[in-house]
Amino acid sequence: MGNKFLLSVLAGKIGARLQGPDDEVSGIAAVDAAGPGQVTFLSNPKYAPQARETKASAIIAKQPIPGAGCAFLLTPDPYLAFARAVGQFHPPVQLAAGVSAQASVHPTAALGKEVHVGPFAVVAEGAVVGDRVTLYPGAYVGKGAEVGEDTVLHPRVTLYEGVRVGKRVLLHAGCVIGSDGFGFAPTPEGYRKILQVGTVEIGDDVEIGANTTIDRAALGVTRVGPGTKLDNLIQVAHNVEIGRDTVIAAQVGIAGSARIGNRVMIGGQSGLAGHIEVGDGVMLGGKTGVTVSLSAKEDRAWSGIPAMPHRTWLKMVTLLPRLPELFRRVTRLEGGKSPEGGE
């Protein structure tokens, strides 16, 4: 049975003000799916028509919505209040402390208080696992690795030897931290592997999505700063440094020794060349190809391949469909003929 709240109580927990009847609610749902006894939210005005038709008991919103026949939980930031409300109705699962008989914990490993180690999880020689850490089945903490308190490793997360993970970190299924960087020296006989002898450091309050891979440094440290959030299926190469509170969407690839600043936003499927810098506060649109260093002082938003100011890119893509006609017009004006295959 889920949590139930009077709307007045829920309002206090999410930083909102109740306007309307103080009904009891027991869940949260999308604006077009919510029913009686549930809360929904409106942060994008384009969904106001659906909000007017909702069957929800209450809407989290900036201001009352004319025509909506329900209560309102009013707040300056509906999206943040929505995030808090979800946490009230669906609190994180707390697994019972203890070590499964099917787990493997090396005698020299150190486990903190109230740690959960699930079946087939492995804690290797000299590893340190902090208080209240959760290791789901199949998680692997390598030799000498460190895991900070209140961190969660979902199934099949792999921390290689010597990796350091901070506090309150959430690592989703299948992510790999500390595998070898892609380093090879060409020789006449082929490629000789360069041993990757550095490590990876993950700061506090980081979240890393499923099947994301972060390579250990060749020398030194590959670093992800505090509060940064990485989506699924991201590749972070050796010696990359990512600042704090940066967000990176799925399928991004970051080549070796790139430097990403604080509060950067990177859209999905973007690619960043090695040894470049992306400054604090820069925003990259989806599929952006970054081949040179970028700074918010030049322009905050960048898109395209190669990366260019977003407004320039918008003008360019607007012109692209017109290029065949423009080409024909220029050809006629010059009195020439279109090249073979032209129209």
Model-identified regions with their sequence ranges:
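Terminal amphipathic alpha-helical/low-complexity segments used for targeting or macromolecular assembly
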Residues: M1-Q102, V163, R168, G174-C175, ...
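Structural signal for interior beta-strand "rungs" in well-ordered beta-sheet cores
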Residues: F41, G98-P309
